[in-house]
């Protein structure tokens, strides 16, 4: 893709997201979603082959269906309230339709089937954009409509998403699919807290984006797409491989890493609201996520593949790419736990 075209496409993606985030009018939000969706499809198809074509088609069909459902919900709401304002949702059916549309856009269960398939079919760079930037717009709308959302529906979706995110990743050897299932689980945690403390959802989203960006950037250094290629990285980049493994444990929510903060805070907030069973179930199902990350760490770090001695010297001569953004991203993705007392300002 030529640089001017790429710049225009990226600018359109950003503009679409910004329109959604800054609008309080349903029509503008819908236009922002459409701009964002149509601009991201060429990014997904950057490396043109049947796999990317299939992934882009799946993405388009899902997002178009979600946009249609959203507009349907908006129209029903308009019929009953006579207003296009986001905060005024007076009809329960409209609220449910909007929630379902946004869960489809986010890839929450039971509308999650497109996420692993699309992520697996595209390049690492496109996957990184899909699992980070593309979550911001739907989450911002969910944040705005959170007072009108059906609590039981969203808690059910959140619980099932955390379960599916953990269960789906258990048998995977493809790193992109593992990241996709991890994304489903993280979105589930965010959906669970959004009604009770929307500000905490933003904290969770920021930490999730930081951890996912760092992990994808490290995968891109060596074009690692499978657990086997990750274990081969020990010979080329021993330090980077060990950082990837720490980041993965952070994504799994292992204390004392940054990924533990949102889980801890969400469980605390839900129990404050007299909810005991749901946070308990979510904490138990989160162990599935941690298990497959631990298994990946074990298979990569502790079971070394046979290699010749000259291979072990390879890292000294390897010309590494420039990684200016990586050090601050890695630090924030792993070492933020001591700053947790500062979160008291959220209350």
UniProtKB/Swiss-Prot annotation:
<feature type="transmembrane region" description="Helical">
    <location>
        <begin position="66"/>
        <end position="86"/>
    </location>
</feature>
<comment type="function">
    <text>Core subunit of the mitochondrial membrane respiratory chain NADH dehydrogenase (Complex I) which catalyzes electron transfer from NADH through the respiratory chain, using ubiquinone as an electron acceptor. Essential for the catalytic activity and assembly of complex I.</text>
</comment>
<feature type="transmembrane region" description="Helical">
    <location>
        <begin position="3"/>
        <end position="23"/>
    </location>
</feature>
<keyword id="KW-0830">Ubiquinone</keyword>
<feature type="transmembrane region" description="Helical">
    <location>
        <begin position="178"/>
        <end position="198"/>
    </location>
</feature>
<keyword id="KW-0813">Transport</keyword>
<keyword id="KW-0812">Transmembrane</keyword>
<feature type="transmembrane region" description="Helical">
    <location>
        <begin position="149"/>
        <end position="169"/>
    </location>
</feature>
<dbReference type="InterPro" id="IPR050175">
    <property type="entry name" value="Complex_I_Subunit_2"/>
</dbReference>
<feature type="transmembrane region" description="Helical">
    <location>
        <begin position="323"/>
        <end position="343"/>
    </location>
</feature>
<keyword id="KW-0999">Mitochondrion inner membrane</keyword>
<feature type="transmembrane region" description="Helical">
    <location>
        <begin position="96"/>
        <end position="116"/>
    </location>
</feature>
<feature type="transmembrane region" description="Helical">
    <location>
        <begin position="201"/>
        <end position="221"/>
    </location>
</feature>
<keyword id="KW-1278">Translocase</keyword>
<keyword id="KW-0472">Membrane</keyword>
<dbReference type="Pfam" id="PF00361">
    <property type="entry name" value="Proton_antipo_M"/>
</dbReference>
<keyword id="KW-0249">Electron transport</keyword>
<dbReference type="InterPro" id="IPR010933">
    <property type="entry name" value="NADH_DH_su2_C"/>
</dbReference>
<comment type="subunit">
    <text>Core subunit of respiratory chain NADH dehydrogenase (Complex I) which is composed of 45 different subunits. Interacts with TMEM242.</text>
</comment>
<dbReference type="Pfam" id="PF06444">
    <property type="entry name" value="NADH_dehy_S2_C"/>
</dbReference>
<keyword id="KW-0679">Respiratory chain</keyword>
<dbReference type="GO" id="GO:0005743">
    <property type="term" value="C:mitochondrial inner membrane"/>
</dbReference>
<keyword id="KW-0520">NAD</keyword>
<feature type="transmembrane region" description="Helical">
    <location>
        <begin position="25"/>
        <end position="45"/>
    </location>
</feature>
<dbReference type="GO" id="GO:0006120">
    <property type="term" value="P:mitochondrial electron transport, NADH to ubiquinone"/>
</dbReference>
<dbReference type="InterPro" id="IPR003917">
    <property type="entry name" value="NADH_UbQ_OxRdtase_chain2"/>
</dbReference>
<dbReference type="GO" id="GO:0008137">
    <property type="term" value="F:NADH dehydrogenase (ubiquinone) activity"/>
</dbReference>
<dbReference type="GO" id="GO:0032981">
    <property type="term" value="P:mitochondrial respiratory chain complex I assembly"/>
</dbReference>
<protein>
    <recommendedName>
        <fullName>NADH-ubiquinone oxidoreductase chain 2</fullName>
        <ecNumber>7.1.1.2</ecNumber>
    </recommendedName>
</protein>
<feature type="transmembrane region" description="Helical">
    <location>
        <begin position="122"/>
        <end position="142"/>
    </location>
</feature>
<feature type="transmembrane region" description="Helical">
    <location>
        <begin position="274"/>
        <end position="294"/>
    </location>
</feature>
<keyword id="KW-0496">Mitochondrion</keyword>
<keyword id="KW-1133">Transmembrane helix</keyword>
<comment type="similarity">
    <text>Belongs to the complex I subunit 2 family.</text>
</comment>
<feature type="transmembrane region" description="Helical">
    <location>
        <begin position="237"/>
        <end position="257"/>
    </location>
</feature>
<dbReference type="InterPro" id="IPR001750">
    <property type="entry name" value="ND/Mrp_TM"/>
</dbReference>
């Amino acid at each position: 893709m030529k640089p001017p075209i790429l710049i225009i496409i990226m600018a359109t993606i950003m503009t679409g997201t910004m329109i959604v985030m800054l609008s309080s009018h349903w029509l503008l939000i819908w236009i922002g979603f459409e701009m964002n969706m149509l601009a991201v499809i060429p990014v997904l198809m950057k490396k043109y082959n049947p796999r990317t074509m299939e992934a882009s088609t799946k993405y388009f069909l899902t997002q178009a269906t979600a946009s249609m459902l959203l507009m349907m919900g908006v129209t029903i709401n308009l019929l009953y309230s006579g207003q296009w304002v986001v905060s005024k949702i007076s009809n329960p059916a409209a609220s449910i339709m909007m929630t379902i549309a946004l869960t489809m856009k986010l890839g929450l269960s039971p509308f999650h089937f497109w996420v692993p398939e699309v992520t697996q079919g595209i390049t690492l760079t496109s996957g990184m954009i899909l699992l980070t930037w593309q979550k911001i717009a739907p989450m911002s709308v969910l944040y705005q409509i959170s007072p009108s959302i059906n609590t039981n529906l969203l808690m059910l979706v959140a619980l099932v998403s955390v379960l599916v995110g953990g269960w789906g990743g258990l048998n995977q050897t493809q790193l992109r699919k593992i990241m996709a299932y991890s994304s489903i689980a993280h979105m589930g945690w965010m959906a669970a807290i959004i009604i009770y403390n929307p500000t905490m959802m933003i904290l969770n989203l920021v930490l999730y984006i930081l951890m996912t960006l760092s992990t994808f950037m490290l995968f891109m250094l060596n074009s690692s797409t499978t657990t086997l290629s990750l274990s081969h990285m020990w010979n080329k980049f021993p330090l980077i491989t060990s950082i990837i493994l720490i980041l993965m444990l952070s994504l799994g929510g292992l204390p004392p890493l940054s990924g533990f903060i949102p889980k801890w805070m969400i469980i605390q907030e839900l129990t404050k609201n007299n909810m005991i069973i749901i946070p308990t179930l979510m904490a138990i199902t989160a162990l599935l996520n941690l298990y497959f990350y631990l298994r990946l760490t074990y298979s990569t770090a502790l079971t070394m593949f046979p290699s010749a001695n000259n291979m072990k010297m390879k890292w000294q001569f390897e010309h590494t790419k420039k990684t200016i953004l990586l050090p601050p991203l890695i630090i924030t993705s792993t070492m933020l736990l001591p700053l947790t007392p500062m979160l008291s300002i959220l209350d």
